[in-house]
Amino acid sequence: MEKINIAMAWWWTGWHVFPIKSLIQHIYKHPQYFQKIQKIVRFGEKRSLEYQVFQDLKQDHKSLFFQSIISWKYRRETWFSSRIKNIRDMFKFTYWVLQSIHYFKKHKIHILFCKWWYVALPVVFAAKLLHKKIIVHESDVRSWLVNKIASKYADQVFTGFDWVLPKSTTVGQILSDDIINHTSIKNIPQENLLEWQELTPAQKLFYTDPQKTHLLVIWWSQWSKRLYQNLLQSIDENYSIYQNYEIFIILWKENKNLKSEFSKYKNIHTFDFVSQGDMWLLLKHCDISLTRAGTTSLAEQKLFNLKIVMVPIPWTHDQYDNAKFYVKKHGDILLDSKDPNYQKNMSDIFKKYKDFKKKNSKKDIFWEIQSAKDIIIKAILSTKTWHK
């Protein structure tokens, strides 16, 4: 039986890198999948989180390859400089397609699986010109430009929500198995130093007051510094409200300088970075989240039944549409950072929910995490999909 070579193109921030990592891990957990594959080639930018994560995966799986490429972005801002850059990049686009064609031939790619970011578009054109099969997954309520284009050439289109793209199949989000870690941390007294020292910082923090409402703050590293600063100011001015919470804040790399400011409050616990395994603890034990409105992160939080307060990135349509969907379907809360009363609205929300405790989820979390990946992988490996 001929084995296939798969190309994957995606974006490089955490909640886009981790799903493709999860998809690859899922393949290698199941012999019926990985026995049909000769290699998986990850197309992306080398100086990025995607490269770091992929290199970690490669240590365990020698059939993985990272292919660094130059990428393209269409800028929809109205600034003159953005228009000039778009014109310049359109001339460069031909070169980027040609480099992708070269790498497709080098790695003898049979099929492309892609997501929505600009790094994927030259790769999609290369796949089409070489008559390779294309599978697309769109995670948002409203499709981005790249996937609108890619879906026109795709042999199969999957979405996270209904009615997003024509002729698509709704499978939900691609989520990580690591967020269903079942390690118990109960009944480990601090006096038992050996076991206590084996706990991660996240595990130790859940010996905090269980009667309080647990709030998780999980904005991205990019474009979120002002949000963290606004939250800190709101806490400083309204601590009588926030003292009712145990607050867990993930700062990420670009906001670590705020750690000392948050840490002056005993009920606020900060993390520079959280693994997917520790994310399970945070999602399992927290009641409310304050977050952006990226669909992968929202889906993870809703699996564990959190009440979600969403602050969409103000200049992108997708996050507002995602947030509106969650408001309508789940009764979650949209907090607009462009509103002049943003900080007051935020403190009012947390005053209202200071005694809130979530109900335990009755969902089959394991099935929800596995099903989308199984459907997509079976489509990738189907001989009807890729075999000429």
Language model: regions and residue ranges:
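Conserved nucleotide-sugar phosphate-binding/catalytic loop shared by glycosyltransferases and other
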Residues: I6-A9, T13, Y33-K92, H269, ...
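Active-site-proximal region of nucleotide-activated glycan assembly enzymes
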Residues: L129-F206
